[in-house]
């Protein structure tokens, strides 16, 4: 990651390592097994070019996690591609189908 961050001028504010227990309760579990996860806080310039740089940086991080059988936390941002969501959360399409079934008027919404 260091090489990627340097090559792409990604400004890492900090990273934390957290131990996460397996989630057996959620329909879309983040942790499918006990994980040691890394949370990155990246400096984002809140202008179009800065947001685009952060989008690409997070997509590269998601790809790196997916290649290792990991996931990413769905609600941290909306930068994941459709393929990344489907790769990390194979039941996502089923989740959307069930949501539509149980919430046909789509009252429960998120701008995520």
Task: Label every model-predicted segment.
Residues 1-57:
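C-terminal substrate-recognition/cap domain of FAD-linked oxidoreductases
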Residues 1-4, 8, 60, 64, ...:
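Generic, well-ordered alpha-helical scaffold segments in large soluble proteins
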Residues 10, 54-58, 78, 88-91:
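Active-site-proximal structural scaffolding
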Residues 37-41, 61-63, 94-98:
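Short, surface-exposed linear patches
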Residues 53-68:
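Long, well-ordered alpha-helical scaffolding segments within enzyme catalytic domains
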Residues 66-112:
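Activity-critical C-terminal alpha-helical subdomain
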